[in-house]
C-alpha cells in the first residue's frame, strides 16, 4: 500500500518586468515641451505615467497617464513656460498587478536665453542638460535663416560651456538687382 499526503501545488504567473525604459527626448516646441518615452511593447505594460519637476528635481508631480500605451509615446506638456523656466521629467510604467515599475532616466528641458542688445552679435546662454547616464558630450548650436526654413548647424560647443556668441552678420542677405 502507498499513501500520499495532501499536496497542493500553486503556480503564480507574473508579468514580465520591462527591461527597457528610456526617456529619449525632451524638446521645446514654441510654448510646449514634447517628452518622448521609449518603452517595451508587449511587456505587460498596463499604464504609462509622466512626472514633472519644476524645482530642479526636489519633487515630482504626476502630470499625465495613459492606459495601454504603444511605444514610442510622446506627451505634449502645455502647462509650461519654456521661455523662462527649465523642467525635469521622468516616466514610469504600471504592470497588470498595478505595480509601478520601469522608471526611466530623467530628462531636462534646456532654457535658452539670447542677449540681442547688439544688432549683429548675439549671445546665447543655456542651462546644462543634467542627469544623462553618460553625460553630455557636446552641444550643437543650430540657426534658422528666414530664407531657408530648415535649421543648420553653426557650432559645436564643449559640454562644459553653456555660452556662445555668434555674428549673425554672415546671415544678413543683401538684396540685388537682377
Predicted features, each with a name:
Residues 2-44, 82-83, 95-135, 171-176:
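Pro/Thr/Ser/Gly-rich low-complexity, intrinsically disordered linker/stalk tracts
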Residues 47-84, 137-177:
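Recognizes extended acidic, P/S/T-rich segments that occur
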Amino acid at each position: 500500500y502507498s499513501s500520499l499526503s495532501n499536496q497542493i501545488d500553486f503556480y503564480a504567473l507574473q508579468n514580465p518586468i520591462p527591461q527597457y525604459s528610456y526617456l529619449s527626448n525632451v524638446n521645446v516646441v514654441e510654448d510646449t515641451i514634447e517628452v518622448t518615452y521609449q518603452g517595451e511593447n508587449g511587456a505587460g505594460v498596463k499604464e504609462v505615467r509622466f512626472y514633472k519637476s519644476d524645482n530642479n528635481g526636489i519633487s515630482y508631480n504626476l502630470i499625465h497617464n495613459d492606459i495601454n500605451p504603444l511605444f514610442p509615446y510622446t506627451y505634449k506638456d502645455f502647462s509650461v513656460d519654456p521661455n523662462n523656466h527649465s523642467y525635469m521629467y521622468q516616466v514610469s510604467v504600471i504592470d497588470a498587478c498595478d505595480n509601478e515599475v520601469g522608471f526611466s532616466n530623467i530628462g531636462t528641458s534646456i532654457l535658452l536665453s539670447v542677449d540681442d542688445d547688439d544688432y549683429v552679435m548675439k549671445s546665447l546662454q543655456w542651462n546644462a542638460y543634467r542627469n544623462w547616464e553618460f553625460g553630455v558630450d557636446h552641444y550643437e548650436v543650430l540657426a534658422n535663416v528666414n530664407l531657408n526654413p530648415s535649421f543648420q548647424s553653426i557650432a559645436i560647443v564643449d559640454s562644459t560651456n553653456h555660452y556662445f556668441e555668434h555674428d549673425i552678420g554672415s546671415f544678413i542677405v543683401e538684396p540685388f538687382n537682377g
